[in-house]
From Swiss-Prot:
Belongs to the hssA/B family. The lineage of its organism: Eukaryota, Amoebozoa, Evosea, Eumycetozoa, Dictyostelia. InterPro entries: HssA/B-related. Disulfide bonds: none annotated. It comes from the Eukaryota. GO terms for biological process: culmination involved in sorocarp development; slug development involved in sorocarp development; sorocarp development. This is HssA/B-like protein 33. The gene is hssl33. Residues 73-88 have a biased composition (Basic residues).
Amino acid sequence: MTLFSSISSMSSSMTSSRSSFSSFGSGTSMGSNSIACSVGSGGGGCGSGSGGCGDLTGGAKSSGGSCGGKGGPHNHGHGNGHGPHGHGGKGSGGSCSC
């Protein structure tokens, strides 16, 4: 029962994160990428190189939404249709980018 309770509490916190993410940034609904960014970044909720949220080694893409992450000089970011492309040192430049 303890496990079930913690799963349902995590799920409700993710739902509330989704509604808050969709209310800022570029004005579009952020969907699952922003949630993965805030929950899976491993410290701080602003893309730290994990899960499609801006690669600190200058890798393939940033989320292009509210959690762009720092990224390297080659981190151009595809954006996945959720916001502006991130160029250079700062991911997408949304309200959660570091």
